[in-house]
Structure formats: structure tokens, C-alpha cells
Amino acid sequence: MTDDKDVLRDVWFGRIPTCFTLYQDEITEREAEPYYLLLPRVSYLTLVTDKVKKHFQKVMRQEDVSEIWFEYEGTPLKWHYPIGLLFDLLASSSALPWNITVHFKSFPEKDLLHCPCKDAVEAHFMSCVKEADALKHKSQVINEMQRKDHKQLWMGLQNDRFDQFWTINRKLMEYPPEENGFRYIPFRIYQTTTERPFIQKLFRPVAADGQLHTLGDLLREVCPSAVAPEDGEKKSQVMIHGIEPLLETPLQWLSEHLSYPDNFLHISIVPQPTD
């Protein structure tokens, strides 16, 4: 992979200032103060909210506490979506800090998966990494790794250790020089305007004539509504890690540098702000 390490670091250390507030109907023994935290964009809510859980449990009776879950403006937050994706999709046009409501009751069974422990997060994460490598390398790279390498990937993410993670992840971002890129680009496109969870299709980083495909090429093929016509008004923002990449950016470069730790490009399509 091309070594733009500053880009990798900027992506890894992206943070979202967040204010956690206990839901008003939760029963407490005294007033629950809000809890402020800088959330890592690349991580998952269930990995980084132990302090939030302990903070609010201090003012609650044990019998009033069940499985914790989070909500933003009425929308339950999926723990298996990376934090940065959740923010870009649901709150990118709102003022900071991001205001998240904490619940300990009335778990929304229809909207969220249960997360009994961090092992569930690890299993989901590794499943995504393996799926991504199947697309990129026919699973050859991930299958050649030892179990300790898989564990190092996970521990690097869980403990927020950039070098620990990238020592292993770098292998997943390599490809034979004669091929100019991966077999297929692991991506998922999310929209707030549809009930469909996401769009995911097979898409090669290099065209048949050898030209590098761009982000715009991908969108025009799989989600044309996200791209404004040449003479038309821009109605959508295309966001990855809180930024709007140029549509001319090569997809291979984006996959190497702006993928989340699960090795997928998580692309949010949100309405263009009106102000």
C-alpha cells in the first residue's frame, strides 16, 4: 500500500465530543449528572462506554438496571456500527457535543441486537475483517495469519493502539504490484432516506481498460441518487470519517486509507444541509 501514514493516524485518532445523559424516565436515587467523553470514531459504543455505564449506575438501584443501550433523537444506536458511521449518518449536521441518551430499560428488540459481552463485539469485528479479505484477496491473507495475529488486530482496536493494530492490518492492505489493487473493494453505503440497512455489491478498483475507478464511479453505478447531475443542484453529502472526499479520489486509495478497522469503507449518504 502507499504509505500515507499521516492520513492513517488522522483517521485513527479522530474523536467526537459526546455528552451522555440518562433518560428522564429512568429511576434514580439522586440526580444523574451528564457524562462527557471523547469517542473514538473507529471504535464501537460497547467498547468505550464502560465509564458511562459505571457513572450512571452509581445513582441507580441495582434492580432498576438491565442491559444498557443508547439513543440519539429517538433512534436507537446500533452497537455493531462503528461510532464514526453512526455520527456521520445521524448527527453530522448537528452541533457538538453529540448528545446521546442512555437507557437501562425497555430494550428495543426490533431495532437492536443484544450485546451480552465484548466477545460479541470481537466476533462481529473479526467476521467483517474476514469478509473484507474474502473480497480483497480470496481470504488468502487472513487465512495465512496465525490466531495471535487476529488477536493483535482486535486488541489494537480495543486498547486504542495504532501501531499494534497497523503492524498486522498493513498485511491486509497489500496486493501484488502487477494487479494495481484489490480484487474487489469492501464497501457499504448507508442512507437515512431508506429502510434498507446498506448497499453492498461487487465492485473492482480497476476498470477493464486499466483505469483506476473513483468514488464517483462507484456511486454512479450503485447509488446514482447520491451524485448530482452536472447541471443540477447538489442534494446529498457523501461522508467517510466526517469528511467529504472528492468524487475523483481513486477507490483503491480510499480503501487503503479511509477504511474502518473492519477493513470496510463505510460511506454515509446524508441530505445536504440547507443552511
From Swiss-Prot:
Superkingdom of this protein's organism: Eukaryota
Single GO MF descriptor: Atg8-family ligase activity
Residue positions, PTM N-acetylmethionine: 1
Major location category of this protein: cytoplasm
Name this protein carries in UniProt: Autophagy protein 5
Family of the protein in this entry: Belongs to the ATG5 family.
Subunit description: Forms a conjugate with ATG12. Part of the minor complex composed of 4 sets of ATG12-ATG5 and ATG16L1 (400 kDa); this complex interacts with ATG3 leading to disruption of ATG7 interaction and promotion of ATG8-like proteins lipidation. Forms an 800-kDa complex composed of ATG12-ATG5 and ATG16L2. The ATG12-ATG5 conjugate interacts with RAB33A; this interaction is bridged by ATG16L1 and promotes ATG12-ATG5-ATG16L1 complex recruitment to phagophores. Interacts with TECPR1; the interaction is direct and does not take place when ATG16L1 is associated with the ATG5-ATG12 conjugate.
Cytoplasm is among the record's keywords: yes
Compartment annotation: Cytoplasm; Preautophagosomal structure membrane
Modifications made to the protein after synthesis: Conjugated to ATG12; which is essential for autophagy, but is not required for association with isolation membrane.
InterPro entries named in the record: Atg5 (IPR007239), ATG5_HBR (IPR048940), Atg5_HR (IPR042526), ATG5_UblA (IPR048939), Atg5_UblA_dom_sf (IPR042527), ATG5_UblB (IPR048318)
Function as written in the Swiss-Prot or TrEMBL entry: Involved in autophagic vesicle formation. Conjugation with ATG12, through a ubiquitin-like conjugating system involving ATG7 as an E1-like activating enzyme and ATG10 as an E2-like conjugating enzyme, is essential for its function. The ATG12-ATG5 conjugate acts as an E3-like enzyme which is required for lipidation of ATG8 family proteins and their association to the vesicle membranes. Involved in mitochondrial quality control after oxidative damage, and in subsequent cellular longevity. May play an important role in the apoptotic process, possibly within the modified cytoskeleton. Its expression is a relatively late event in the apoptotic process, occurring downstream of caspase activity. Plays a crucial role in IFN-gamma-induced autophagic cell death by interacting with FADD.
Underlying gene: Atg5
Keywords: Acetylation, Apoptosis, Autophagy, Cytoplasm, Immunity, Isopeptide bond, Membrane, Ubl conjugation
Cross-link Glycyl lysine isopeptide (Lys-Gly) (interchain with G-Cter in ATG12): where in chain: 130
Gene Ontology biological process terms in this record: aggrephagy; antigen processing and presentation of endogenous antigen; apoptotic process; autophagosome assembly; autophagy; axonal transport; blood vessel remodeling; cardiac muscle cell apoptotic process
Membrane topology: Peripheral membrane protein
GO annotation, cellular component aspect: Atg12-Atg5-Atg16 complex; autophagosome; axon; axoneme; cytoplasm; glutamatergic synapse; membrane; mitochondria-associated endoplasmic reticulum membrane contact site
Record-linked Gene3D superfamilies: 3.10.20.620, Autophagy protein Apg5, helix rich domain, Phosphatidylinositol 3-kinase Catalytic Subunit, Chain A, domain 1
